[in-house]
Structure formats: structure tokens, C-alpha cells
């Protein structure tokens, strides 16, 4: 009988600030636990964090710190994939293809767009739509 493939999980966390207890309880702790049952791909979503203005040096530092934190809580890069979003060109290329095939009306109804627009009314940019 053929070996059954494990289901795959893709998830990411933005390096927008100091990780909180909420980040740990709500996501990161579960990521470590899910590794035994799933094929996991976890990303530090640095490109997603660009929808809010960032100081480049701070973003690079927080990206490294977040990757180190994920390793420290038990994400196993020998068994699963841990990557920085901006280091994978195919991610940006696919984003462009999807953006060119998604209607503006669909994007404007997204809850993340509405939430971020309300929180940062002085910085509503095109990146929020993707």
C-alpha cells in the first residue's frame, strides 16, 4: 500500500515588533506542536510587514530575531521548512500574477484591509490590497 502523505501547513508571522505572549500562545507554540502530524512550512513574512512604514535596519534585525525565536521554540529546520519571505523570489512573482487576476472589489472587502486602514489612516497603500 502506498504511504499516506501528511497534510501540509503554510503559516507566517510578520516581524513588525517584539514578539508577545499572545504571539506565542496564539500561534508559535502551536506551530511547534503541529510538526509531528503535518509537513510544515513557516515563514517570517517580512514583505507582508511593508504595508506599514518600516525602518529597513530595524526590519532586518526583527526578521533575524524572529527566525531565531522560531528555532528556539522548537521549529525543526531539518524536518520542516522555515524561510524568510523576501528570500523566495517565486513568492513575489506569484503575488504579481494573483494581483493581476483579482478584482478590486474583492480586495476592498478583505477584513485585513479594513482593519489596517482603520489603524493607519495616514498610510493606506496599495500593498494592503494584496
Give the role of each language-model region.
Residues 2-130:
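N-terminal Rossmann-like or analogous alpha/beta NTP/dinucleotide-binding catalytic cores
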